[in-house]
Protein backbone atom coordinates (compact mmCIF):
# COMPACT_ATOMS: atom_id res chain seq x y z
CA UNK A 1 0.00 0.00 0.00
CA UNK A 2 2.93 2.38 0.61
CA UNK A 3 3.67 2.20 -3.11
CA UNK A 4 0.29 3.67 -4.07
CA UNK A 5 0.08 6.16 -1.19
CA UNK A 6 3.40 7.68 -2.36
CA UNK A 7 2.56 7.70 -6.06
CA UNK A 8 5.07 9.92 -7.87
CA UNK A 9 7.11 10.18 -11.07
CA UNK A 10 8.70 6.76 -10.74
CA UNK A 11 5.32 5.14 -10.18
CA UNK A 12 3.81 7.04 -13.13
CA UNK A 13 6.66 5.87 -15.35
CA UNK A 14 6.05 2.33 -14.11
CA UNK A 15 2.40 2.64 -15.21
CA UNK A 16 3.40 4.13 -18.59
CA UNK A 17 5.76 1.21 -19.12
CA UNK A 18 2.85 -1.15 -18.48
CA UNK A 19 0.78 0.48 -21.25
CA UNK A 20 3.66 0.48 -23.72
CA UNK A 21 4.45 -3.11 -22.85
CA UNK A 22 0.91 -4.24 -23.61
CA UNK A 23 1.00 -2.45 -26.97
CA UNK A 24 4.35 -4.08 -27.76
CA UNK A 25 3.06 -7.52 -26.80
CA UNK A 26 0.01 -7.18 -29.03
CA UNK A 27 2.17 -6.16 -31.98
CA UNK A 28 4.57 -9.04 -31.33
CA UNK A 29 1.67 -11.50 -31.04
CA UNK A 30 0.43 -10.33 -34.45
CA UNK A 31 4.00 -10.47 -35.83
CA UNK A 32 3.66 -6.81 -36.81
CA UNK A 33 6.78 -4.98 -37.91
CA UNK A 34 5.57 -1.94 -35.93
CA UNK A 35 6.63 -3.64 -32.71
CA UNK A 36 10.12 -2.32 -33.45
CA UNK A 37 8.88 1.29 -33.25
CA UNK A 38 7.57 0.65 -29.75
CA UNK A 39 10.90 -1.05 -29.03
CA UNK A 40 12.60 2.32 -29.46
CA UNK A 41 10.22 4.19 -27.13
CA UNK A 42 9.77 1.60 -24.39
CA UNK A 43 13.46 1.33 -23.37
CA UNK A 44 13.53 5.03 -22.49
CA UNK A 45 10.69 4.50 -20.02
CA UNK A 46 11.96 1.27 -18.54
CA UNK A 47 15.59 2.41 -18.53
CA UNK A 48 14.84 5.24 -16.11
CA UNK A 49 12.76 2.92 -13.95
CA UNK A 50 15.43 0.24 -13.72
CA UNK A 51 18.14 2.76 -12.88
CA UNK A 52 16.03 4.13 -10.04
CA UNK A 53 15.57 0.63 -8.63
CA UNK A 54 19.23 -0.38 -8.95
CA UNK A 55 18.66 -2.92 -11.74
CA UNK A 56 21.77 -1.87 -13.62
CA UNK A 57 22.00 -4.83 -15.97
CA UNK A 58 18.39 -4.29 -16.98
CA UNK A 59 19.20 -0.61 -17.55
CA UNK A 60 22.07 -1.55 -19.83
CA UNK A 61 19.76 -3.95 -21.60
CA UNK A 62 17.51 -1.06 -22.59
CA UNK A 63 20.38 0.48 -24.57
CA UNK A 64 20.76 -2.84 -26.35
CA UNK A 65 17.01 -2.86 -27.02
CA UNK A 66 17.20 0.42 -28.92
CA UNK A 67 20.05 -0.81 -31.12
CA UNK A 68 18.36 -4.18 -31.60
CA UNK A 69 15.13 -2.43 -32.62
CA UNK A 70 16.92 -0.83 -35.57
CA UNK A 71 18.48 -4.17 -36.50
CA UNK A 72 15.19 -6.01 -36.04
CA UNK A 73 13.26 -3.61 -38.23
CA UNK A 74 15.87 -3.91 -40.98
CA UNK A 75 15.83 -7.71 -40.74
CA UNK A 76 12.05 -7.96 -40.90
CA UNK A 77 11.66 -5.36 -43.61
CA UNK A 78 14.46 -6.15 -46.04
CA UNK A 79 15.95 -9.56 -45.21
CA UNK A 80 14.42 -12.65 -46.82
CA UNK A 81 15.01 -16.34 -46.12
CA UNK A 82 15.88 -17.07 -49.73
CA UNK A 83 19.09 -15.08 -49.22
CA UNK A 84 20.15 -18.05 -47.09
CA UNK A 85 18.83 -20.69 -49.47
CA UNK A 86 21.51 -23.23 -48.58
CA UNK A 87 20.12 -23.54 -45.04
CA UNK A 88 17.31 -25.93 -44.22
CA UNK A 89 15.18 -23.25 -42.58
CA UNK A 90 15.19 -21.06 -45.70
CA UNK A 91 13.81 -23.39 -48.31
CA UNK A 92 10.45 -21.57 -48.48
CA UNK A 93 10.90 -17.82 -48.95
CA UNK A 94 7.16 -17.09 -48.81
CA UNK A 95 6.18 -14.50 -46.22
CA UNK A 96 2.77 -13.70 -44.67
CA UNK A 97 3.41 -10.06 -45.59
CA UNK A 98 4.93 -9.29 -48.96
CA UNK A 99 8.51 -8.12 -48.64
CA UNK A 100 8.90 -9.13 -44.98
CA UNK A 101 10.91 -11.91 -43.37
CA UNK A 102 8.76 -15.02 -42.75
CA UNK A 103 8.45 -16.80 -39.41
CA UNK A 104 10.54 -19.99 -39.18
CA UNK A 105 11.68 -22.53 -36.57
CA UNK A 106 14.90 -22.13 -34.59
CA UNK A 107 17.46 -24.32 -36.44
CA UNK A 108 18.90 -27.12 -34.30
CA UNK A 109 22.42 -26.46 -35.54
CA UNK A 110 22.35 -23.09 -33.78
CA UNK A 111 21.21 -24.33 -30.36
CA UNK A 112 24.66 -25.24 -29.00
CA UNK A 113 26.56 -22.12 -30.16
CA UNK A 114 23.74 -19.85 -28.99
CA UNK A 115 23.69 -21.61 -25.60
CA UNK A 116 27.46 -21.12 -25.25
CA UNK A 117 27.15 -17.44 -26.10
CA UNK A 118 24.30 -17.08 -23.61
CA UNK A 119 26.31 -18.64 -20.78
CA UNK A 120 29.29 -16.45 -21.61
CA UNK A 121 27.12 -13.32 -21.56
CA UNK A 122 25.63 -14.37 -18.22
CA UNK A 123 29.09 -14.78 -16.72
CA UNK A 124 30.42 -11.48 -18.06
CA UNK A 125 27.37 -9.48 -16.98
CA UNK A 126 27.42 -11.11 -13.54
CA UNK A 127 31.08 -10.18 -13.11
CA UNK A 128 30.38 -6.59 -14.14
CA UNK A 129 27.52 -6.32 -11.64
CA UNK A 130 29.44 -7.69 -8.66
CA UNK A 131 32.57 -5.72 -9.56
CA UNK A 132 31.27 -2.32 -10.60
CA UNK A 133 27.77 -1.92 -9.12
CA UNK A 134 25.91 -2.28 -5.83
CA UNK A 135 23.28 -4.58 -7.34
CA UNK A 136 21.50 -6.65 -4.69
CA UNK A 137 20.36 -9.27 -7.21
CA UNK A 138 23.33 -9.77 -9.55
CA UNK A 139 22.66 -13.44 -10.33
CA UNK A 140 19.05 -12.98 -11.45
CA UNK A 141 19.67 -9.59 -13.04
CA UNK A 142 22.54 -10.91 -15.15
CA UNK A 143 20.62 -14.07 -16.08
CA UNK A 144 17.55 -12.24 -17.38
CA UNK A 145 19.71 -9.71 -19.20
CA UNK A 146 21.81 -12.36 -20.96
CA UNK A 147 18.81 -14.45 -21.94
CA UNK A 148 16.94 -11.34 -23.10
CA UNK A 149 19.81 -10.50 -25.45
CA UNK A 150 19.58 -13.96 -26.99
CA UNK A 151 15.78 -13.81 -27.17
CA UNK A 152 15.81 -10.42 -28.84
CA UNK A 153 18.25 -11.69 -31.45
CA UNK A 154 15.94 -14.67 -32.06
CA UNK A 155 13.01 -12.27 -32.41
CA UNK A 156 14.93 -10.26 -35.01
CA UNK A 157 15.51 -13.52 -36.89
CA UNK A 158 11.76 -14.18 -36.57
CA UNK A 159 12.21 -17.62 -35.02
CA UNK A 160 9.04 -18.94 -33.38
CA UNK A 161 11.03 -20.32 -30.44
CA UNK A 162 11.93 -16.79 -29.34
CA UNK A 163 8.67 -16.99 -27.38
CA UNK A 164 10.03 -19.88 -25.29
CA UNK A 165 13.11 -17.86 -24.38
CA UNK A 166 10.91 -14.94 -23.35
CA UNK A 167 8.77 -17.33 -21.30
CA UNK A 168 11.74 -18.05 -19.05
CA UNK A 169 12.83 -14.40 -18.93
CA UNK A 170 9.34 -13.15 -18.11
CA UNK A 171 8.75 -15.68 -15.33
CA UNK A 172 12.02 -14.81 -13.59
CA UNK A 173 11.48 -11.07 -14.09
CA UNK A 174 8.01 -11.26 -12.54
CA UNK A 175 9.47 -12.53 -9.28
CA UNK A 176 12.41 -10.12 -9.49
CA UNK A 177 10.22 -7.04 -9.97
CA UNK A 178 7.90 -8.03 -7.14
CA UNK A 179 10.97 -8.24 -4.92
CA UNK A 180 12.14 -4.83 -6.18
CA UNK A 181 8.68 -3.31 -5.54
CA UNK A 182 7.83 -2.43 -9.13
CA UNK A 183 4.24 -3.78 -9.14
CA UNK A 184 3.01 -2.48 -12.51
CA UNK A 185 6.03 -3.89 -14.30
CA UNK A 186 5.72 -7.15 -12.33
CA UNK A 187 2.09 -7.47 -13.46
CA UNK A 188 3.15 -6.76 -17.04
CA UNK A 189 5.75 -9.52 -16.96
CA UNK A 190 3.32 -11.95 -15.36
CA UNK A 191 1.00 -11.26 -18.29
CA UNK A 192 3.96 -11.64 -20.66
CA UNK A 193 4.60 -15.09 -19.19
CA UNK A 194 1.11 -16.28 -20.07
CA UNK A 195 1.13 -14.60 -23.47
CA UNK A 196 4.47 -16.19 -24.35
CA UNK A 197 2.72 -19.56 -24.48
CA UNK A 198 -0.12 -18.21 -26.60
CA UNK A 199 2.28 -16.26 -28.80
CA UNK A 200 4.36 -19.35 -29.51
CA UNK A 201 1.27 -21.27 -30.61
CA UNK A 202 0.14 -18.33 -32.75
CA UNK A 203 3.50 -18.01 -34.51
CA UNK A 204 3.64 -21.74 -35.24
CA UNK A 205 0.39 -21.33 -37.16
CA UNK A 206 1.95 -18.54 -39.24
CA UNK A 207 4.93 -20.59 -40.43
CA UNK A 208 4.70 -21.05 -44.22
CA UNK A 209 3.83 -24.62 -45.18
Where are these regions (language model features)?
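Hydrophobic/aromatic-rich structural module bridging two neighboring secondary-structure elements via a short loop
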Residues: 39-89, 93-99
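Polytopic alpha-helical membrane-helix bundles and their juxtamembrane interface segments
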Residues: 1-31, 35, 42, 79-87, ...
Amino acid sequence: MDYFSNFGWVEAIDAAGLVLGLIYLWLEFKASIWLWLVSVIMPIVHGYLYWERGLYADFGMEVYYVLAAVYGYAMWRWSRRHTRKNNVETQNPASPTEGELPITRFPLRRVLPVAVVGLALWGVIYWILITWTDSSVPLCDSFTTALSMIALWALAQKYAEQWLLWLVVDAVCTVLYIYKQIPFTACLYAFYTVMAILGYRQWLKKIPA
